[in-house]
Amino acid sequence: VENYHHQHQNVRTENGIEYGDTVDKMDFDYLAKVTMLNVLTATALADAPPAPASATLGGAVTSNTTVRWDASLGAHAYRIYQRRADAQDWSFVRELQGTETVLEGLIVDDHFVGVSALGKNGAESTITFAGLPPRR
């Protein structure tokens, strides 16, 4: 929990209260854990191919959703994720090669879809949110 007497404050004293980010108020064990998590995340992302630049959905007036995405340089395969519009977590759907798939029985109005790129080393990019197809 943030302590706003110490975080995001200029160093000063007002009404007997010391404000500001100072070394004596640091939690170095916590800082080390956060730093390690950041390093591990950056390493995993650096080993992965870039995420697809864009992804689109089709499926109006049908019970299937067509997903298309741009190829990513260095991608060996792609992972498709979906989640209901009222859910917060992605669910893995399938892994495939190519840049298009049809998700049978997945209604586009009720779900969000995303695509990530997978390297030969197994490293995975961030997920690209698939929106509606561009207007023409």
Regions of interest found by a model, annotated:
Residues 1-136:
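Secretory-pathway/membrane protein signature
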